[in-house]
Amino acid sequence: MRVQVVDPSAYTPPYDHALCAALARAGADVELVTSAFAYGSAPAPDGYRLHELFYRRARGPAGSRVRLATKLLEHIPDMLRYRSVATGADVVHFQWLTVQWLDRYLLPSRPTVLTAHDLLPREPRLAQVRAQRRLYGAVDAVIAHSDYGRRQLVLELGVDPARVRVIHHGAFEYLTRIAEGELPPELGADDPGGPVALFFGLLRPYKGLDVLLEAWRGLGEPGAELWIVGRPRMALEPLRVRLPRGVRWVPRFVSDAELAACFRRAEVVVLPYSSTERFDFSGVLATALAFGKPTVLSDVGGFGEVAATGAARLVPPRDPGPLRAALAELLGDPGLRSQLAEAARAAAAGPYSWDAAARRTLELYRELVG
């Protein structure tokens, strides 16, 4: 089976790498077709080939308007060039297609799969939602990461249920094999000694950081610290005016080595998201499972399906009271943390393993090829 996994903008290198490596272990001939990752180093190929075909002339800092403009200029020529490359594949598996109204006309004439990392475009307008719906209709199969995601695709976006397959997002266990390293310098050289709760990932309004800080304000756990680590995509100044005690910030993109150090040190990982209408899972949650970390999750999207494994505490979204209570319980009870950690490791080795995801993905490919 010759498979091309395609992520034009290199939005999710960890996911791309883990999927390609797992498909290769399962016997597929895999090529990752993407672009250079603008924020730092990406995982090295492991059993698959790498082809950085897209946006080779992109200029400007990562995330800048200049870089976006140069990528848009290259988009149509690169998608057309990719169509000639795709003739060597039995199946083409897109991870992202972000110019929805245009990309459906540029798909290669091969069996195509699209993973719905974002069920809807970010901050969607009506025209974007319509374009996303048409794009889903143009591919042969759509992958959701949870039953919740499947329901959203079918009920809200009108995708044919026969073309939607639920395949769990694998746990990022490759990150656990990174050598022991130093924490980000912003966290200080001295270990705080007390328990640490970690909030990790791009800082966006829907992730509930304001609710988390309010919950932390009333937490009575002595010596506990909250580490907020990730690149801001929102204004942080209003949140930093009255910070509660014990909060440390790393407001930037961190390396994989720093990421691994943060997760190893944390006792609890917290995802207090206020909404997941546009997506159904989280790479941060996949990382927490891989490291065997107990999690506190808002009851949104597909998070409840992970909590059902026993790996997480589930709390109502946008409510600091229950969030505070769950954090206090876990930070203060090592025995309970061990219980949830064991369930997290079992989930990462079982239903949320990349080998399980690869098996199900290959089954889908074979159905499409016939």
Label the predicted regions:
Residues 329, 336-351, 360:
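A short, well-ordered alpha-helix in the C-terminal region of glycosyltransferases
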